[in-house]
């Protein structure tokens, strides 16, 4: 989320912890404390620490199927941006592309885009959310023009970018819809009324809803499917236990 701020944040190497700066494969549990450190799992997904909004320490333990936050020392005002977005993704994020990914792919070519996730929650102020990025060009670096967020959980007095525009039903679930702009890209957020811990769904259903609202066209490109947490405070123990995503044309 909020890619412009991420792009302007310089990398800070922590003095302690395992430092992973390249997206190398994770064969056993590894710890990432580097600000933008990442690694690959299952030979197809990238897990990233992505501590873009703070200089405070954050570490994640990466497993073969996901990750867990093990250190989180920062705190941010709840009326502003979060500390970070530790996450797992398929596709490309600032030139870091998952192995063998079919993304970017033009929306008109996409026939299926299934995804599934299992979250584990603890205390703190955070959201648990998918971050789905689209752009008019097949961009693999920089800020995309459209951000779709799917909030599976919201804890504390935090809210998405923009304001409420209504409610909708997607994938057999009800969602409160928010729309806005964070200064660099448009954002549409779908907020669940109560926490979701596990779900299998079609990313394409959300993309099609955004298209029906006139915010994108079928000529746009899906560039990445990401899932993780945005903590404002606390969060040690939050985890993505399992994640899967694929896009086929």
Residue ranges, per PLM feature:
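Long, compositionally biased interface segments
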Residues: 194-249
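Extracellular-facing segments of soluble proteins and assemblies that are Gly/Ser/Thr-biased and enriched
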Residues: 84-165
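Ser/Thr- (and often Asn-) enriched beta-sheet segments in non-cytosolic proteins
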Residues: 31, 40, 66-70, 104, ...
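Secretory targeting and sorting signals
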Residues: 1-28
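N-terminal segment immediately downstream of the Sec signal-peptide cleavage site
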Residues: 29-80, 249
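Short, hydrophobic/proline-enriched secondary-structure or compact coil segments at domain edges
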Residues: 67-71, 111-118, 130-132, 222-231
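Short helix-loop boundary/capping segments
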Residues: 138-204
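Short, surface-exposed beta-strand/loop "edge" segments at domain boundaries and coil↔beta transitions
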Residues: 74-85, 121-125, 139-143, 197-200, ...
């Amino acid at each position: 989320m909020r890619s412009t701020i991420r792009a302007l944040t310089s990398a800070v190497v922590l003095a302690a912890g395992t430092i992973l700066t390249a997206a190398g494969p994770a064969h056993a549990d590894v710890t990432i404390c580097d600000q933008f450190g990442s690694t690959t799992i299952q030979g197809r997904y990238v897990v990233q620490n992505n501590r873009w909004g703070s200089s405070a320490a954050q570490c994640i333990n990466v497993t073969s199927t996901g990750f867990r936050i093990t250190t989180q020392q920062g705190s941010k005002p709840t009326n502003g941006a979060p500390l970070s977005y530790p996450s797992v993704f398929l596709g490309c994020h600032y030139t870091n592309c998952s192995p063998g990914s079919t993304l970017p792919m033009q929306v008109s070519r996409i026939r299926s885009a299934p995804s599934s996730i299992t979250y584990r929650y603890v205390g703190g102020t955070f959201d648990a959310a998918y971050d789905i990025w689209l752009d008019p060009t097949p961009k693999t670096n920089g800020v995309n023009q459209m951000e779709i967020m799917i909030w599976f959980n919201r804890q504390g007095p935090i809210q998405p970018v923009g304001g409420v525009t209504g409610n909708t039903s997607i994938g057999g679930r009800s969602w409160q819809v928010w729309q806005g702009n964070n200064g660099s890209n448009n954002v549409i957020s779908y907020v669940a009324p109560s926490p979701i811990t596990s779900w299998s769904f079609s990313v394409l259903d959300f993309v099609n809803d955004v298209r029906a609202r006139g915010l994108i066209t079928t000529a746009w490109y899906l560039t990445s499917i990401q899932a993780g947490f945005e903590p404002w405070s606390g969060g040690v123990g939050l985890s993505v236990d399992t994640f899967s995503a694929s896009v086929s044309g």
